[in-house]
């Protein structure tokens, strides 16, 4: 199992190559030549082979997220957990990350668990998805099953409706009383 944290969590004192090599050195007894080959293959898979010598501070946000993804796949895990992988990414980087996660899932047979508020991106790659509200699963199914779900709270979440079962306004007392200083 591996995890891609929202922040990427790269080691700031190691270059990209060393960040990806770290789990291989910690959890295997592979010879250095094989570690080098493996790291270069993982960096090639995420499009960063040419950035191997760069430090995390020299990377864009999207490049840092891809470097962290290369580290997450270094040990060829069967399961990868993604914590908000698309947050704060520009549309191009988001598209690249969606493509990479989809390729990992389908081409390599890796199970990917993606926790995200980016509904269109997740539903475009998910075989099965859950919608959680107030610590409870309120809907589950394929992307099509969720899109066809008539539940008002599911519709509000999927369609980005501002007011509905989840209210826009935080509960408050009488507005006029608050304006006139008669409220709490």
Please provide the spans of the model-predicted regions.
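Conserved ABC ATPase "signature" region
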Residues: 32-50
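Conserved ABC ATPase signature
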Residues: 55-59, 63
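Catalytic Walker B motif of ABC-type/P-loop ATPase nucleotide-binding domains
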Residues: 80-83
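ABC ATPase nucleotide-binding domains
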Residues: 159-184
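Conserved catalytic motifs of ABC-family nucleotide-binding domains
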Residues: 76
């Amino acid at each position: 199992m591996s995890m891609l944290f929202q922040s990427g969590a790269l080691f700031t004192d190691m270059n990209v190559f060393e960040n990806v090599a770290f789990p291989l050195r910690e959890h295997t007894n592979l010879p250095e030549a094989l570690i080098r080959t493996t790291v270069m293959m993982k960096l090639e898979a995420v499009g960063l082979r040419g950035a191997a010598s760069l430090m995390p501070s020299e990377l864009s946000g999207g490049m840092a997220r891809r470097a962290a993804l290369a580290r997450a796949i270094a040990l060829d895990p069967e399961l990868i957990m993604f914590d908000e992988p698309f947050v704060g990414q520009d549309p191009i980087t988001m598209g690249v990350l969606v493509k990479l996660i989809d390729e990992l899932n389908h081409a390599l047979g890796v199970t990917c668990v993606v926790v995200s508020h980016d509904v269109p991106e997740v539903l475009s790659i998910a075989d099965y998805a859950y919608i959680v509200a107030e610590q409870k699963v309120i809907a589950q199914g394929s992307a099509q099953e969720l899109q066809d779900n008539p539940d008002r709270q599911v519709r509000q979440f999927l369609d980005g409706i501002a007011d509905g079962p989840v209210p826009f306004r935080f509960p408050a007392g009488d507005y006029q009383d608050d304006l006139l200083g008669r409220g709490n």
